[in-house]
């Protein structure tokens, strides 16, 4: 399974912190990040439009908004340092940009964990045509 995740990351495109974010998600939720969160609702995955469909989709919406606020580096390629401590994630990078990216990912992974009870498989592979309305960051 681990090999499949690494191969999938390579096929999607090499993105520095994508693997780090995936590890955070797995550690916090015990779910496969690729199959469970890469194409969920209107905001989990690349792009996003419309209104978030549930609490998990809102986690992705907030994550997208967080990335939009990151300055001085590309949040999709910036690698950062972090650790797992006492059931949580601790961002440890001193570089302000990398730390901001880590915080975006930490908050999202924690949000996924906190909303596991409302995760709904019907939002996997959700059709973009169903994503209507607008939501502001």
Curated annotation (Swiss-Prot):
Lipid metabolism among keywords: yes
Subcellular location: Secreted
Reactions the enzyme catalyzes: a 1,2-diacyl-sn-glycero-3-phosphocholine + H2O = a 1-acyl-sn-glycero-3-phosphocholine + a fatty acid + H(+)
Domain of life the protein comes from: Eukaryota
GO BP annotation list: arachidonate secretion; lipid catabolic process; phospholipid metabolic process
Family the entry assigns: Belongs to the phospholipase A2 family. Group II subfamily. D49 sub-subfamily.
Protein's recorded name: Basic phospholipase A2 Drk-b2
Organism of origin: Daboia russelii
